[in-house]
């Protein structure tokens, strides 16, 4: 018989009354008084499950079918028919079923058919993808990534892999994970008692990357338009639903562009993905609407119609001050906008996405282009409702003299960035780029606010299980 997926069935790709084979897991089973069992099967290929009708005349009905419980894996064959009920479009009249795997003790099965809290599901992350919630998120996550790759292919961008292990601190912050093979019980020391990293695997102090941007810029200065996508790491000791120690980042770099170019491009990218998602994942999104009790579809359709607000940092400060709201974090010129400031701006004041630009140079990294006023840099943050900052970007500093000044101001050694500085010495070019936290994008599209539920195996403070 022809093996098919449940998604194939619901795409109307399978002829009614044809004999098919489906492999999957039991969601639930119930018996009728008339000698039938109704088995709900899912295979993860789509949100929908399918009902299978098993007659008690089947040879293994009493020995096996009546003992099927949530989580059992099966391979079944039967006739695809139109359902006479209004809860589903199709059913399968069972001809044959083989149990591939039993649940050892149904009473203690961690993912029973009842609804579980997300807190509990994080404790059984190896099984939680079997639930409707995490399954829907996984499919949406996959399609968002697929859509992003398709967008960049369409826009003639090249994908470039960037290293996960690095000796550079891209963001100039201290929150990095060190990579070392040194014996922790016998660490080699220099005469001044500092660690002798020359004895380490890479011959110098090395870390897990916080960004692939600097490496990506090297390819932007030869291929013109490039992007990368991969895991990044922050050793930030923050145990909240907004932070992960390991998360996925999309980074984009483009030569011969300025701040306005990348602002327009980022907005176009987000709307392309949003439109594709509404077209391809509507069943999963409808489920999440009910789960979160929010109007996700209406919100995303509005997102497609509005133009993002573009506003200078100074104007944002004035809006916050004029609001007369007593924020937890004080508002004054020169502050780094906190999450509450960002969300007030997009959720209460404008109520649509906002691009904040031209930040004080003290708030931003060394590689951001210094504006003519010598006080601000050509940087942007794209803020969206319910999330806050989604994208951070800038026009990169292409002038080596000013780049060196910024490195000095921030206490960074220009010798460590010799190859990055070479880009400014050999055919320098105006270029710009941005980075986007992938899980934050998923959060915006799904309405799921805790970022730990948006990545298969969250890595957080005191948690590296699975």
From Swiss-Prot:
Enzyme Commission code(s) on record: 6.1.1.22
Lineage: superkingdom: Bacteria
UniProt keyword list: Aminoacyl-tRNA synthetase, ATP-binding, Cytoplasm, Ligase, Nucleotide-binding, Protein biosynthesis
Protein name: Asparagine--tRNA ligase
Self-association and partners: Homodimer.
One example of a Gene Ontology biological process annotation: asparaginyl-tRNA aminoacylation
CDD domains registered for this protein in UniProt: AsxRS_core, EcAsnRS_like_N
A GO molecular-function annotation: asparagine-tRNA ligase activity
Primary localisation category: cytoplasm
Protein biosynthesis listed as a keyword: yes
Family membership noted in the UniProt record: Belongs to the class-II aminoacyl-tRNA synthetase family.
Catalytic activity: tRNA(Asn) + L-asparagine + ATP = L-asparaginyl-tRNA(Asn) + AMP + diphosphate + H(+)
Any GO CC annotation of this UniProt entry: cytoplasm
The gene coding this protein: asnS
Annotated PROSITE patterns: AA_TRNA_LIGASE_II (PS50862)
Subcellular locations according to the entry: Cytoplasm
InterPro entries assigned: Aa-tRNA-synt_II, aa-tRNA-synth_II, aa-tRNA-synth_II/BPL/LPL, Asn-tRNA-ligase, Asp/Asn-tRNA-synth_IIb, NA-bd_OB-fold, NA-bd_OB_tRNA
Keyword Cell wall biogenesis/degradation: no
